């Protein structure tokens, strides 16, 4: 068979959809299964899986350590994933892609600004109506004696409104600025290394998938990757 190369993102190992597709719950178990498949594919078929170093490698190792994965699993990462730094000074990309990326980021920044403005208007409006409602219910005869309680109530309402608004703002802002685009250096390194090696990209990230398509790179969804390796092994190598 033709030699296959894959360039993997952190999500190729850690994504929850990978665990679901494998039918396991724990990250340690799913990581071991994935790395064993990668090892079998490399030994029997010469399939190589590359990981950008140090950016994506450090990200993956840090995640596995935080999840208390055993040392044996982390050793498998060093053994079976080929660590390589993309040659950022030699890889050539069309200028049109840079233009598209800048335009995309500018549109997202403007959208984020509008979301921020709407959040401020919303919090001010809801807070005003809430305080106005409290004032209308206040008994004029006991206004002076309950002034402290009223101020405390106003503060509670304001804090509640701001808390809900900030939470909503964060979710909308994150979606507007980060979903479907490259939002980190490791994401870019995955694409650059795949371009350099003519490798397929393996990830569970909308931004990486979108820009892999624009670069003309092969893309494999993380949840499908273990079954692709199994199919290769079943067809060309040892049966699993």
Curated annotation (Swiss-Prot):
GO terms for biological process: tRNA 5'-leader removal. Belongs to the HARP family. CDD domains: PIN_VapC-like. InterPro entries: RNA_free_RNase_P (IPR014856). It holds the Pfam family PIN_5. This is RNA-free ribonuclease P. It catalyses: Endonucleolytic cleavage of RNA, removing 5'-extranucleotides from tRNA precursor. It is an enzyme of class 3 (hydrolase). One of its GO terms (molecular function) is ribonuclease P activity. It comes from Methanococcus aeolicus (strain ATCC BAA-1280 / DSM 17508 / OCM 812 / Nankai-3). RNA-free RNase P that catalyzes the removal of the 5'-leader sequence from pre-tRNA to produce the mature 5'-terminus. It comes from the Archaea. Keywords: Endonuclease, Hydrolase, Nuclease, tRNA processing. Its EC number is 3.1.26.5.
């Amino acid at each position: 068979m033709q030699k296959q190369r894959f360039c993997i993102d952190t999500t190729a190992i850690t994504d929850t959809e990978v665990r679901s597709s494998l039918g396991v719950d724990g990250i340690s178990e799913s990581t071991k299964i994935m790395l064993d498949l990668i090892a079998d594919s490399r030994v029997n078929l010469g399939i190589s899986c590359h990981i950008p170093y140090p950016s994506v490698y450090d990200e993956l190792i840090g995640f596995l350590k935080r999840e208390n994965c055993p040392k044996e699993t982390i050793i498998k990462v060093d053994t079976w994933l080929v660590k390589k730094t993309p040659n950022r000074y030699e890889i050539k990309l069309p200028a049109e892609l840079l233009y598209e990326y800048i335009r995309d980021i500018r549109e997202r920044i403007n959208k984020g600004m509008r979301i921020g403005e709407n959040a401020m208007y919303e919090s001010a409006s809801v807070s005003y109506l809430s305080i106005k409602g409290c004032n209308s219910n206040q008994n004029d005869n006991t206004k002076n004696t309950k002034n402290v309680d009223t101020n405390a109530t106003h503060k509670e309402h304001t804090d509640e409104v701001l808390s809900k608004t900030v939470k909503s703002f964060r979710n909308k802002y994150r979606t507007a600025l980060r979903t479907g685009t490259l939002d980190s250096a490791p994401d870019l390194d995955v694409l650059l290394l795949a371009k350099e090696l003519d490798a397929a990209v393996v990830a569970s990230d909308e931004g990486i998938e979108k820009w892999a398509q624009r670069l003309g790179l092969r893309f494999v969804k993380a949840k499908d990757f273990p079954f692709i390796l199994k199919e290769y092994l079943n067809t060309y190598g040892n049966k699993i």
